[in-house]
Amino acid sequence: MGVYLSTPKTEKYSGEGGNDRLRYGLASMQGWRTTMEDAHTALPRLDECTSFFGVYDGHGGKAVSKFCAKHLHLQVLKNEAYSSGDLATSVLKSFFRMDEMMKGQRGWRELAELGDKGQKFTGMLEGIIWSPKPGESDKPEDTWTEEGPHSHFPGPTSGSTACVAIIRNDELIVANAGDSRCVLSRKGRAYDLSKDHKPDLDAEKERILNAGGFIVAGRVNGSLNLARAIGDMELKQNEFLPAERQIVTAEPELNTVKLSEDDEFIVLACDGIWDCMSSQEVVDFVHKEMNTEDSLSAVCEKLLDHCLAPVSGGDGCDNMTVIIVKFKKPSKSAATSSTNQSVSSEEMRPNELDDGPSDPNK
């Protein structure tokens, strides 16, 4: 369900870049929706040997998705676990940190600036890529808390999915909360590296009910069709439960994959793509287009056009964002050069089973 334009906005925000180990392309499009609530981050050089890519699909407004695109990767860098090499813990804590940072006066002010109350963005400019200035990632951030009339702001009622991929040498870590998705192509076969967090999944349903929530027509408390998300603070108000056990939680599911020469690329995309095509269909589409098109951003644009519905209503009418990250032949050297920076691992099973992440190692 949603409010649609009389004609779709088909202008696209596109970009591409890379480093010694990979190259990427991305594109986003507002489509039939009246607003653009997707955001994304693409950083081939988060540090000298690490790349970071993320897609964020907002609901109830664009502020939370843009907040994540601006801040989540910086929190990964700042977390003490990151400096010790524990990428999984650093990204896990950074998801929860987003909820904390959006509270209080500073959170209210940032959300107001990024959302509808702040500067207006239209068309393709609403698809945000956060590009830190040289050295910005290394600067200690000022104390986040500040005093003001909104010091007791409990956080936003709007929210966002978050699906990020962190690549360090031959290790790929995917962290996901919500129904955006990351898919790996290995020898032409699609492997889901994330799981869509819908309320009717047994583990999600159990947590929702235990926290005092309910599910109606596949929606948490009759409103949200996601079981995990950043933001949505009205569904995280049980003071007797930790953050990971709230009705809706920002806790990401983590997946770690050791990359090999058989791995060709990953696709990160919001559900505007996955509602129209299966994981394997997207992988097949990308392979076919790459046979004749070298520009990955052009491939992304073609994928958006392929998914766009001819008329409003049904699949193909959502905002659409996609990032393709293509791996170069593995080498021992770290990813030291880059261009165009733009802004508990469970067992996996084959993609076609549709009951969880799939295992590229089987």
Curated annotation (Swiss-Prot):
Recorded hits in Pfam families, A to Z, give: PP2C (PF00481)
| Names of the cofactor(s) | Mg(2+); Mn(2+)
One GO biological process this protein is involved in is: signal transduction
- Which Gene Ontology molecular-function terms are recorded? metal ion binding; protein serine/threonine phosphatase activity
Q: What is the E.C. number? A: 3.1.3.16
Q: Which reaction does it catalyse?
A: O-phospho-L-seryl-[protein] + H2O = L-seryl-[protein] + phosphate; O-phospho-L-threonyl-[protein] + H2O = L-threonyl-[protein] + phosphate
Q: Which residues does UniProt call coiled coil?
A: none
Composition skew (Basic and acidic residues), residue ranges: 135-150
Q: Which family does it belong to?
A: Belongs to the PP2C family.
Record's protein name: Probable protein phosphatase 2C 70
